[in-house]
Amino acid sequence: IDVLSRNSTWTLSRDTSLGLNYTGISYYDGQGFMIRKSLKVNSALELNSASICVQTGTTNEQNTSDYFKGNNMKYEVIAFGTADETVKAYESGRCDVFTSDVSQLYAERLKVANPAEHVVLPEVISKEPLGPMVRHGDDQWFDVVKWTLFAMVGAEELGITQKNVDEMAKSDKPELKRAFGTDGNLGEQLGLTKDWVSRIVKAVGNYGESFDRNVGAGSKLGIARGL
């Protein structure tokens, strides 16, 4: 594959030991907790003595330990090797709580038999920076992927959208002229065409449009934008 984009937190060990480079942060996730509404729990601070399903080999294990110890609460960990095993155990009632990154909790909630019977609690107990990864050793491709992400973020800041991209390309504003390649040729430094930013926005939209379509208000997940 050319690009790996998934919920693998950017950590020092992953960045230095896997032969991969993180190209930037495209999404700030964070660990949360999902629980059945029938248990009438409104806050993670009410989870003292709860049993918690967690996937091994993730940052979730250590984060859970730190959070409960820091709040002087007891808990029981029930660990599983894969995400599917963890979710199935939670759904079958083997534990009170399922903990993972909030984005995964929303996604897994859609798969359970009765999604409306489960709630993601408001507390986010960690910061999990996520972003596209590429292989070591191909610096040009690393630059292309990195600056594609930056271009999507910059397009949103400048008000460039899929609908208005052609009109915005006619602007006399210096920053827009540079972005669209009508003043200079930044794309050439990446091995791309002058209109590389326009092509990106036309294909997938700016960062906000992509967020809304895939995980935000325009998706089944309905995750709030946050940062």
Specify the residue positions occupied by each region the protein language model found:
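Acidic, polar ligand-binding/catalytic clefts
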Residues: 1-46, 102-126
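Extracytoplasmic low-complexity repetitive segments enriched in small/polar residues
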Residues: 12, 93-95, 156, 200
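Extended ligand-binding regions for polar small-molecule ligands
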Residues: 35-41, 45, 49-59, 104-105, ...
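Conserved C-terminal helix/tail region of periplasmic/extracytoplasmic solute-binding proteins
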Residues: 213-227
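Extracellular/periplasmic bilobed ligand-binding domains
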Residues: 81-117, 132
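Bilobed "Venus flytrap"/periplasmic-binding protein-like clamshell domains
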Residues: 9-10, 28-85, 139
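Alpha-to-beta junction loops
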Residues: 1-7, 50-53, 91-100
